[in-house]
Amino acid sequence: MGQEQDIPWILSTGHISTQKGENGQQTPKLEHHNSTRLMGHCQKTMNRVVMPKQIVYWKQWLSLRNPTLVFLKTHALKRWRLFSKHEWTS
């Protein structure tokens, strides 16, 4: 699973198409740019806090159509609290 954390979220979604750049080269084009950027921000924040890999459930993130920053923060906090509570009791 260590290698999976190094893979950017945009590559794991399969929502990548291409667009031609100014020089005619094909470049990746994100289908859901805002949600991808928000997820990247949350992923970096969670990594800084050294949250265990169990906290991040990729399928949940991928199932979100238009996540808002408030929702993502709330969701991450709930997951962190549940994990912390579990760690203290075990």
Curated annotation (Swiss-Prot):
Please verify whether the record's keywords include Membrane: yes
Residue spans crossing the bilayer:
none
Question: Which cellular component appears as one GO term in the record?
Answer: host cell cytosol
UniProt subcellular location:
Host mitochondrion inner membrane; Host nucleus; Host cytoplasm, Host cytosol
Compositional bias, Polar residues, is annotated for 14-28
Q: Where is this region: Mitochondrial targeting sequence?
A: 65-87
**Record site feature (Low pathogenicity), residues:** N66
Further notes on this entry? Is not encoded in all strains, and seems to be dispensable for replication.
Family, according to the entry, reads as follows:
Belongs to the influenza viruses PB1-F2 family.
Q: Please report the name of this protein according to its UniProt entry.
A: Protein PB1-F2
Whichever gene encodes this chain, its name is PB1
